[in-house]
């Protein structure tokens, strides 16, 4: 393997969903642009590039979204049984304000017109394309020693209104992006006992899906 190949694998292994590790500084514009450039180079069905990136840095917007996320997190917590709630409570949904930068990735289902090459029978390939851009962004951020935290505790209609996103464009991810003090060795959900990762062999099938 070349050094570059090893670096790719190292980035994948060290990728973490960052919450409490942001150092309070803001990622500089040049670095952010390199990271977004990597995201924009992701593969996409029919070369439609159905994503857009909304960079959010205004403190009032960050604060408003953080408050909304806290409410959504509480709603989820209230649905848990006592034992599961005890495991969940230490898991914080932080980083919206301390990262100083939110990158909202959107998906435009109309990008590319009515007939998109490769999307005719599997419509979700458009959405999958936008998610590939997120993965590119995340790995590029790791290479820059920049953390990313994917926030999914939000109401889509609220975020659409907050950022004045036109229909039918959808916000599919709010990513907290910023320099970090360090990356955790063990993913948070494993550290706090919420869920452990599956071994590759459990996910690997040959020729047909193996029923357990």
Predicted region positions:
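Small-aliphatic-rich amphipathic alpha-helix that forms the alpha element of a beta-alpha
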Residues: 35, 39, 103, 112-162
